């Protein structure tokens, strides 16, 4: 959403926005961008809904990534990591100001997979763990450690691995080929690492290390990334060279 398009959002009940869009390869919001959209929403009475499935739960160094940009959303969508992969659950979190209908109409929030009591228990524990001070410290350490290693890998393959987008452990790795992230994904998978290319920008690999990784595991991850990027580079550049002969 371009800032000038906010002028017409008064006709909309809500604006749903992914704090850092995953399928675009995690382009980082410009300073003031999300805050400007929230201000425009408030001006005309439109709700701001933040999709925090990818960026929440300390991945950006705060419990919710959108708050790192000075924004308090009216509603928030979370899932996946909320139960650490142990029990499937997703959530729509509503601010008190806009939650009256939940008590007025008990059927208003029913769903096919609703009432996940076990999932709620697991989710509460995950939230408690994420808010421990040592977890915030770990996120800072892991993001800095892995970034330093990725910078070295990029230096080794500068004609192919060209950029790193990052906020905490949310990262987009840029490659100098229209679909450069696809062979990197393939070779990572062959080396036991799961990271997917960005559907709407296949040059970029979505790369999100876990927030509780040890130094040893981080080092092993970087070794495997080095192997995968090198193999993808040879595959891509070798193919390009053969076409020019």
Say what each PLM segment does.
Residues 1-245:
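Conserved N-terminal phosphate-binding loop of PLP-dependent enzymes in the Aspartate aminotransferase
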């Amino acid at each position: 959403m371009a800032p000038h398009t906010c002028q017409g959002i008064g006709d909309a009940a809500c604006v749903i926005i992914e704090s850092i869009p995953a399928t675009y390869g995690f382009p980082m919001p410009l300073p003031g961008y999300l805050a400007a959209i929230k201000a425009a929403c408030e001006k005309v009475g439109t709700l701001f809904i933040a999709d925090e499935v990818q960026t929440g739960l300390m991945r950006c160094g705060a419990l919710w990534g959108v708050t790192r940009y000075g924004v308090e959303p009216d509603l928030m969508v979370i899932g996946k990591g909320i139960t650490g992969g142990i029990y499937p659950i997703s959530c729509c979190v509503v601010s008190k100001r806009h939650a009256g209908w939940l008590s007025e109409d008990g059927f208003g929030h029913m769903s096919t997979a609703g009432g996940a009591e076990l999932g709620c228990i697991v989710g509460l524990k995950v939230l408690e763990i994420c808010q421990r001070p040592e977890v915030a410290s770990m996120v800072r350490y892991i993001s800095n450690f892995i970034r330093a290693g990725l910078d070295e890998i990029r230096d080794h393959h500068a004609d192919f691995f060209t950029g790193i987008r990052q906020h905490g452990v949310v990262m987009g790795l840029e490659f100098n080929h229209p679909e450069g992230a696809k062979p990197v994904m393939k070779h990572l998978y062959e080396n036991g690492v799961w990271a997917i290319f960005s559907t709407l920008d296949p040059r970029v690999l979505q790369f999100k290390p876990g927030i509780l990784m040890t130094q040893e595991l981080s080092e092993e991850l970087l070794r495997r990334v080095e192997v995968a990027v090198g193999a993808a580079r040879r595959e891509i550049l070798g193919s390009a060279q053969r076409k020019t002969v």
